[in-house]
Amino acid sequence: MNKKLEQLEKFKTNDKNPVYSTTNTGVSLSDDANSLKAGPRGPTLLEDFVLREKITHFDHERIPERIVHARGTGAHGYFLSYKDHSKLTKADFLSKQDKKTPVFIRISTVQGPRGSADTVRDVHGFAVKFYTDEGNYDLVGNNMPVFFIQDASSFPDFVHAVKMEPQNEMPTGGSAHDTFYDFCGLKPESAHSVLWVMSDRGIPISLRHQQGFGVHSYRFINQEGKSTFVKLHWKPLSGTCSLLWDEAQKIAGKDCDYHRRRFWEDIESGDFPQWELGAQLLDEDLQKKFDFDILDPTKLIPEELTPVIPLGRMVIDRNPDNFFAETEQVAFCVSHVVPGIDFSNDPLLQGRIFSYLDTQLSRLGGPNFNEIPINRPVCPFANNQRDGIHRMTINKGGASYFPNSIDKGYPLLKEPSANKGGFRPYPENISGTKSYDRSETFEDHFSQATMFWNSMSQHEKNHIIAAYTFEISKCSRPEVRTRYVNNILVNIDSVLAEKVAKNLGVKIEPTSTKPIKKIMVKPSPALSQPNLLSGDIVSRRISVIIEKGVDYDDVINFKDDMEKRGAMVMLVSSTLAQVECSGGEMLSPKGTIIGNPSIFFDAVYVPKSTEEATKILSDDGNFLHYILEAFKHLKTIAFGGSVSVIKELLRLPQDHGLLLGNGYKDITEQFFYSLAHHRVWERESKVSKIPA
């Protein structure tokens, strides 16, 4: 157990222990199911303080949800530094090899409220709180390295535009509506980020299969006081991959908690999600070679120009004991930094430094939110802040000011030093004329958007075209659709614009006479998800369909083989009743075909069975739909023995992800190979006629 979990234990209670029920003030209760009345059928009495306390507390159980990132899930873990990075930063948690620091992670969607679905198309928040020996450090980022706006002044406008429309509070959990595309069509700096959302990055297959980014440029300050600008990255050890859009929509309807459930179950089973933290180092000489400004949050730095240097590994290994107390009350603030880490002049970052702190005051009830157990640092903390709503600390002593002599000057100030000193901002030289002007280096809104488009594989480009078509078609105003195609997409790529325009019935207008600032940028292979797979099947989910007459050995041997490779295998049947195998053995399914559809899995295996079992499956419409849907979603499917006739029954065209054999031995290696490649992309052009 790490320091943070040990600290939280002091605040926990176990109501399963043999204790008596009491009021909030400790008075034992003799009745907690009936109100106090004047006779069995008489009116309820005002003096019933037990009833009033219970109802009053219930009436105030909810707190304001986050304005953005309301829908999220979190868990505990630890960060392990790979080595002593003190030449880069004096931050203590990176100061020596194998130094272990407790963390809490929260991953979220942006647009929807707490009750929205997990698998909507959206940016995903990726926030990590490090409980370091020098105080809390919050790295508050997203699963995309760029943002929609360049200056914090536009943040309320952006959020108002993407959120549900004010007249009808729709749509929930999506950006496919007029106000968002009206804003973005008039705000070309959003082009790059919207393109990322329309890509497969907007619909990750699971929370553990997405990258995280710090978005902004930060400073690392080393022991000598030298500053280096950095961009911070989280790379999942599980690889990076996504759902298909049709799949994501269906999952949202059949299990709106799909992402959080999968994350929770992985942790409970001991299959811990892991990410590697890395940094791109941006010294001044290197910055001069860039055609963009590192202070512009709508830009990324291609890894081909500046590699990501690994710093350490994060392991998420424990679920919360109470969602509200931990995940809902955790407060991430961009302003939470430690010695060795400092800010840049990114104008969006500068506004976030204020905004994240400010929003906690209303959401968590005042300035003492850092005293809530999940937010407390694990190192000693003391200052002259006093009182306020929900104060938990009892301060002794007569002085609450600095300087003082009454309490011998305590708490003392710590001088900045090379090691474990007090925080002092980097002494940056600043000069300039006060103005609202934006730097000319921020004016190129399309070069990197085009780079991202050109970096995509063909199937990724097809998905982007389909996503724009779906989203913009939901806009009811023709002028919004026309403007976005002509103001934004035309300036990203002509093929993209032409195909989306055709799908929307929009006419591409003659090229504007107003020139746009744009340069050629080489494609970046590091941006394409097929290049980011892990090469294994760890944490992948496989459905094994069993009915009466299935071959017991084939099921067990396949299951054992896949689980040894790190996959999760579930036996699925038409009912939850035990299934009698061909040799008389019994198997217990863990899910039903209807309750655990193919969209919940990455691959399907139909084991060797008797002709009776094959007949049962062939006559089961739910099963046939199951296979058709898995095929349409480009998943690996294998049939063993006589059940291979189902392939012919469904007229499925052959490809390398549709496997036939006499049992698990014939298909195991091909199954692994196909699943490790995530989806059978060559199949995508063939599935348009599949009625699933």
UniProtKB/Swiss-Prot annotation:
One protein family per Pfam: Catalase-rel
GO biological process, one term: response to oxidative stress
Catalytic function, reaction form: 2 H2O2 = O2 + 2 H2O
UniProt KW keywords: Cytoplasm, Heme, Hydrogen peroxide, Iron, Metal-binding, Oxidoreductase, Peroxidase
Active site: H69, N142
Sites where the protein binds heme: Y356
GO-annotated molecular function: catalase activity; heme binding; metal ion binding
Induction: By srfA, in response to late development signals.
GO cellular component, one term: cytosol
Location of the protein in the cell: Cytoplasm
Principal location class: cytoplasm
EC number(s) given by UniProt: 1.11.1.6
Organism domain of life: Eukaryota
Temperature-dependence annotation: Thermostable. Still active after heating at 65 degrees Celsius for 15 minures.
Function field: Occurs in almost all aerobically respiring organisms and serves to protect cells from the toxic effects of hydrogen peroxide. Its accumulation in prespore cells affords the spores protection from oxidation during prolonged dormancy. Required for normal developmental timing, possibly through a regulatory role in differentiation and morphogenesis.
Name the record gives this protein: Catalase-B
The gene coding this protein: catB
